[in-house]
Structure formats: C-alpha cells, structure tokens
C-alpha cells in the first residue's frame, strides 16, 4: 500500500514540475521587454513613415534613400517605400511583442544624438515634436501601423490592432 502511494506522490510531483517548467518556458518566450524581444533603438523607418504621413515632412537624417526625400517624392508609388520599410521593421518583431514595441516607440525620447554623416542615421527612433505636427497626432497614427489599412500585421491574440497601446507594460 505504501509503495502505491509513493508512486502516486512521485507521479504527482513529476506532473507538477512539468507544468511549472512549461509555464516558465512560455513566460520566457513571451517576454516583450525592450532589449529582449526587440532592440531599444527600433523602428527608424516607421518614424520616417509616421512623419511623412502625419506631418508631410521628412526627419533630418532620415533613413530613407535620398531620392525619396527629394522633390521627386511626388511621383506615384515612391511614398509607399517608406511604408514598406516600416512594415518590414514591424514584421521582424515577434507577433506577440509588436504592440509593446509600438508602446515603447511612442514613449522614446526625441532623437538627441547627432546624425551620422556616413549613414544618415539618427541615434534613436521616437516621435518628434515639430511645429504644426505635435507628437499626439503622430501617436494617433502609430496606433494604426498594425491595422489592415497599413501594415496588416497580427499582434497578440491574432488581432490587427493594439489594445490599450497608451499603457506600456514595461514601466
């Protein structure tokens, strides 16, 4: 009798350890912290696209090709490259972390590092306060980046929007 209860206890302990190990692995796989699931200097192309769409301007040190920031921008089809590059950046972020990456992107400080003259890259991404184009207007557009009318990317729970994007989970 004692042998049977020992086996049952051992079996129960094994099952519990397996369940806890699976839960820990799942939690580690969905860790959407900045620097873990996505880089902390992310979405430079999305910053350019957001400014292009909301403010009709390009950022100094834009990561877009020079021909896109010139007067030739009015040719049909060229503005879509900014969207394409942004959507590619978002697609590289794990599906369950895209909303958190957008939250982080909206909260980043204004780029303060100088432009690298060889690459044209600004030190960080983030939204910029520009005359006539406040950050809140840009945030409204950032919320739409994963939506069907923009990048059409699935996020957490397989939906194409970010619920409560104003509330960062990493604070």
From Swiss-Prot:
UniProt xrefs under Pfam families: Tryp_alpha_amyl
Alphabetized InterPro entries for the sequence: Allergen/soft/tryp_amyl_inhib, Allergen/tryp_amyl_inhib_CS, Bifun_inhib/LTP/seed_sf, Bifunc_inhib/LTP/seed_store
Gene3D superfamilies: Plant lipid-transfer and hydrophobic proteins
Entry GO terms, CC: extracellular region
UniProt-listed CDD domains: AAI_SS
SMART domains per the UniProt record, alphabetical: AAI (SM00499)
Signal peptide span: 1-24
Post-translational modification: Five disulfide bonds, which are essential for the inhibitor activity, are probably present.
Subcellular location per the Swiss-Prot or TrEMBL entry: Secreted
The keyword Amino-acid biosynthesis is assigned to this record: no
Transmembrane residue ranges: none
PANTHER family named among the record's database cross-references: ALPHA-AMYLASE_TRYPSIN INHIBITOR CM3, TRYPSIN/FACTOR XIIA INHIBITOR-RELATED
Physiological role: Part of a complex with inhibitory activity, but CMd is inactive as a separate subunit.
Subunit field text: Heterotetramer of one CMa, one CMb and two CMd chains.
Protein name (record): Alpha-amylase/trypsin inhibitor CMd
Originating species: Hordeum vulgare
Record gene name: IAT3
């Amino acid at each position: 009798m004692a042998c049977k209860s020992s086996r049952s206890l051992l079996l129960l302990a094994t099952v519990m350890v397996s369940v806890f190990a699976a839960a820990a692995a799942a939690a580690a796989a969905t860790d959407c912290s900045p620097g873990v699931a996505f880089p902390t200097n992310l979405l430079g192309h999305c910053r350019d696209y957001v400014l292009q769409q909301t403010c009709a301007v390009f950022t100094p040190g834009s990561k877009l090709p020079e021909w896109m920031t010139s007067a030739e921008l009015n040719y049909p089809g060229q503005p879509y490259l900014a969207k394409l590059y942004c959507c590619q950046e978002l697609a590289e972020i794990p599906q369950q972390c895209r909303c958190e990456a957008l939250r982080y992107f909206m909260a980043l400080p204004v780029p303060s590092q100088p432009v690298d003259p060889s690459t044209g890259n600004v030190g960080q991404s983030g939204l910029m306060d520009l005359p006539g184009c406040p950050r809140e207007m840009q945030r409204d557009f950032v919320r739409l980046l994963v939506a069907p009318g923009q990048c059409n990317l699935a996020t957490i729970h397989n939906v194409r929007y970010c619920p409560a994007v104003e509330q960062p989970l990493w604070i």
